[in-house]
């Protein structure tokens, strides 16, 4: 019987053909005790959740695992793991977790059931009691029921918090519980590695090093990359190096050697000041601008094009302006010397401030030629001639609207000496004495002459080429008495005005009484229009 069982085991269990069979001590037929045990386990499995059914299937596989020994190179069933010890530990842990879950659920159910019962009791009690007062025994019973419900609520809140904490711990995937999250300080950095494979080998060339550096080939120039190289400012020699700058550098070197203290360096001129200086300085030779910092293979061509643009359009206008200068200058050659002297002083004051050196503002010149750099000749205004003698003040009105004329003074009319000759027919409206503003005109006697002064309103036409009018106060008297009469006239006019204002009083006007118009007659008013527009006004 024992041999037959061995043959059956060997027939069912696969084994390697090149090794000896290892026979286990497992029995083929189950005993009565095992059958009874399985009967009870089936009843228990009906009570437990389907999660426990999976755990109960694993012990059945354990008997099958005992028949097969875990040997390397052996043929075994694909569904069964080779390590039985690992399977046993997994099964035991799963069963333990299932039992703990069942116990926790039962406790939770009991607590919730108690709280529900206590709440139901309280509801029934208060619905029956209504508004009646409670006795001491009833108060103690209500307090006990409230304590039970409060305890269950506190325990449920604590379990929820613990469950949340467990979920946080379980959320840490691929990470231990004590591990800290990666911070910025732990960020990865680049560390170059060297190939030392040929360090131990004896090479024929001793000059070649054993290390090979990892080289970044992206920095190498290529025909398909748009690379821009900058010239170094230290190695670059300025193009505007002249004899003046060399002399200045030699002098400064000598002063340093001799120990002479250097003067403070001159301040740089701003861009706007340099532009103004370049506009004022017309004779300054235009120098080539320094090469740009960016390497441009066509920079030489660009500079030539700019020179061509600067020179060609400005050549013609300067010649035209020079022709205008020749025409303008002869007009001002006949100006007297008194007008030239103040102009010379003004020009001297303009040129007197110390002009900056040429080297200080050449680099601030704008590259493009400005339209403001054209030569413009401004016509010099000659100073006006001032009258030699001042006239005495007089209150008489003396208006003169006249042009230049050459007429000799006559006995009947007195002409002003300063009036130039006019080329038009002139009318002289002469008045011997100014009339008062208010009141009737009165004839006054002057102190110098006892005869009354009569007004002479004479219109004297004169031959001239253009039209003009001269309003002069002409008197039939000598020139010596003219100034005395003017003074007397002012006094008499002021006295007469005061008398007239004192004699006449302001008349009161009555707005209720309509005023009869003296100028308009009955025939001049159109009655039809009055009726048509009567509705627009209030009477």
From Swiss-Prot:
GO cellular component terms given for this protein: cytosol; nuclear envelope; nuclear membrane; nuclear pore; nuclear pore central transport channel; nuclear pore nuclear basket; nucleus
Coiled-coil parts of chain: 91-118
Modified residues (Phosphoserine): 10, 49, 81, 89, 162, 171, 214, 222, 352, 360, 374, 382, 480, 483
UniProt-annotated stretches for the region Disordered: 44-80, 242-267, 305-329, 347-493
Superkingdom of the organism of origin: Eukaryota
Description of how the protein assembles with itself and partners: Component of the nuclear pore complex (NPC). NPC constitutes the exclusive means of nucleocytoplasmic transport. NPCs allow the passive diffusion of ions and small molecules and the active, nuclear transport receptor-mediated bidirectional transport of macromolecules such as proteins, RNAs, ribonucleoparticles (RNPs), and ribosomal subunits across the nuclear envelope. Due to its 8-fold rotational symmetry, all subunits are present with 8 copies or multiples thereof. Binds to NUP1 and NUP2 forming the nuclear basket and the distal ring. The interaction with NUP2 is GSP1-GTP-dependent.
Matches recorded under PANTHER family: NUCLEOPORIN NUP60
Free-text comment about domains: Contains FG repeats. FG repeats are interaction sites for karyopherins (importins, exportins) and form probably an affinity gradient, guiding the transport proteins unidirectionally with their cargo through the NPC. FG repeat regions are highly flexible and lack ordered secondary structure. The overall conservation of FG repeats regarding exact sequence, spacing, and repeat unit length is limited. FG repeat types and their physico-chemical environment change across the NPC from the nucleoplasmic to the cytoplasmic side.
Name of the protein in question: Nucleoporin NUP60
